[in-house]
Amino acid sequence: MKISVDNGSGKYETVWSRKPNWQTPVYKRTFAADRSYYFGRKRRKIEKAPEVNLNPGIEYIFLEKDVANGIALKIEFNFALLHGQKQIDAIGISNSALPIQPTINEISFSDKIQEVEVVPLKGFYPSSPVISTDGKKLIFSSLSDEKEEVFICQKGSNGKWSNPTKEETLSQNSYYNYIEHYGSDFILKGGIGYDKGTQESGYEILKLQSEHYQSQGALKIAAYNNYDETSEATISSDGTILILGIETDFTHGGSDLYFSKKKEDGTYGFLQNMGKMINSAADEGMPQLLSDNKTIVFSTNGFSGYGEYDIYVSYRLDETWKNWSEPQNLGKKINSNDFDGLPFYDERDEKLYFIQAIDGIQYLKQVTIPKSDLMKN
């Protein structure tokens, strides 16, 4: 690696270089190599990322000599010195002698959060947890050998969840089946096959009538476009606001959070990006909008955090739905070195449910967070 500076003469002067050391690796491991996971939206499961022989870290370089009136900086890498995958996330330049330290914008009450508990679901590969608005049902999806299926647990008088029961009528799609909202008025189900250019979005609205699920038709969005086969969604309790985590031509990075408002004809208007404060240059998704229509919890790998994907909270600042507060990390008691995502907050019981991956295995976890802490109003 070599750094050179041009002072306006058109010639670059070397101001820092490293000679190859064939015995000592340039970077040292900062965490176990098998802790890297990503959330594969197309397969709706957590996959182990390709192994990286030498994990990335942060390197601080202080120039050995000053160059006055520098107008250009050239950084040369010799990637042939190290085998395996290579990736440079960012390069920062500062005139300070103090190194720039990455910091995590952590929620103020993170130290008060209780210990996280595992919801026992032996033999299942849980994802997309949802609590019904009456607090009596835990709904989640689990991936079998053939497809994703929907299961429901009933809450007993002791507050414990019953053994899961498969909901056949909610598991009819050929591969993807998941619930994003389960209310007394309507249910939002994802994973529906759809044709692009038809305004269909892969979601449908259901109603539970006499213990039977009745489809109210496909959820349609004006000019809907999504690079992936599926998306993650959340919807306001009255159905007027829809928020999606998708990737389009207008995303700031990978997938972004978008909102859409319901029209008089029952369809939804054009998706609008929720802004640069909440959407990073990486991926945002897995959102849940709480009942105040101001608080949103979601998962992202685009902000300083503890692992691959962390869970954050943000607050809507005005009526445009495009201005949000800086996302706050829910802290290391919730977020691990691995994948933490698909959050769902049960306001009635004041518990956050989420999926955590440990050594490639997904667990459904729960933790108590007071409503007065998580929701500002």
Residue ranges and their predicted role:
Residues 98-377:
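Short, conserved micro-motifs composed of acidic
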